[in-house]
Amino acid sequence: VKRYRAKPIEIEALLWQGDMADLPQEWLTHVVTYEGDTGVLFTKTLQGPAAAEPGQHYLIANLDENEVYPVVVSVFERRYEAVA
């Protein structure tokens, strides 16, 4: 058995606050549904639609895979740090 480490990659991400105006234009094609009354956003991912709740999820853009997907805040903050 060998040990492996994930390769470092840079991503684009934002903490979803429920406002469509915050989304970069190129991410809009990944939106399946937006529930304006709750601010919940559903994005199209390789595994199917995924929900992002305001203040509970970051949205991450993996444009190499042509996808934008939500990640729970606690998981995001464990895995990522800001770059210059």
Language-model features, listed with the residues they occupy:
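Short, compact, well-ordered microdomains
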Residues: 49-84
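N-terminal domain-onset segments
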Residues: 1-47
